[in-house]
């Protein structure tokens, strides 16, 4: 009874625009959707007194995007002037889509995809000027270890940017992928 009722109520709420729904409908790929939304991923930081512009964040810098998905956001950072961009995720299926987009955008020469766990990487100490984790921390099992590892591989004077949707947000827990009812979690 509970599931059927939820299913009926859910029909009253339109699903939010979501990349997986768009990809399933053949509208766009996850990577391209991420790329188009790239500016949205950094707007939180541009309002701070520490960052004056996207060029300030990325220009001439080595950037690691932890929890990059299909790397559309990563490519956006590359287009903002990053010297080298590295995307890291644990989902192997994203790698091909990421390299395809890098080629399409002319970023292949400065892009690397790393399949791995952000809590224990193979990067040398102080490898990156910028580490960004956009909508990633809510997916990691050991956030303290991920942050400690990020600190290890971040260059002295580098910047770590982290944001994630709070669980208690109306569409928290990423249930908006399949359920349009706010606060259902």
Write out the residue ranges for each language-model feature.
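Conserved N-terminal segment of class I S-adenosyl-L-methionine
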Residues: 1-124, 130, 147
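Conserved class I S-adenosyl-L-methionine
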Residues: 161-185
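A short glycine-rich, Lys/Arg-flanked "PGG" loop and its adjoining helix->strand segment in the class I
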Residues: 144-156
């Amino acid at each position: 009874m509970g599931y059927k009722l939820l299913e009926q109520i859910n029909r009253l709420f339109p699903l939010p625009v979501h990349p997986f729904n768009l990809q399933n409908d053949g509208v766009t790929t996850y990577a391209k959707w991420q790329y188009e939304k790239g500016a949205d991923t950094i707007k939180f930081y541009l309002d701070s007194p520490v960052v004056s512009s996207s060029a300030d964040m990325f220009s001439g810098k080595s950037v690691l995007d932890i929890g990059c998905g299909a790397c559309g956001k990563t490519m956006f950072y590359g287009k903002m002037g990053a010297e080298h961009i590295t995307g890291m995720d644990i989902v192997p299926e994203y790698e091909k889509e990421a390299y395809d987009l890098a080629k399409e955008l002319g970023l292949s020469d400065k892009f690397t995809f790393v399949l791995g766990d952000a809590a224990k990487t193979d990067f040398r100490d102080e490898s990156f000027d910028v580490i960004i984790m956009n909508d990633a921390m809510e997916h990691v099992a050991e956030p303290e270890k991920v942050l400690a590892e990020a600190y290890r591989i971040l260059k002295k004077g580098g910047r770590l940017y982290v944001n994630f949707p709070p669980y208690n947000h109306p569409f928290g827990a990423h249930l908006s992928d399949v359920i349009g009812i706010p606060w259902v979690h």
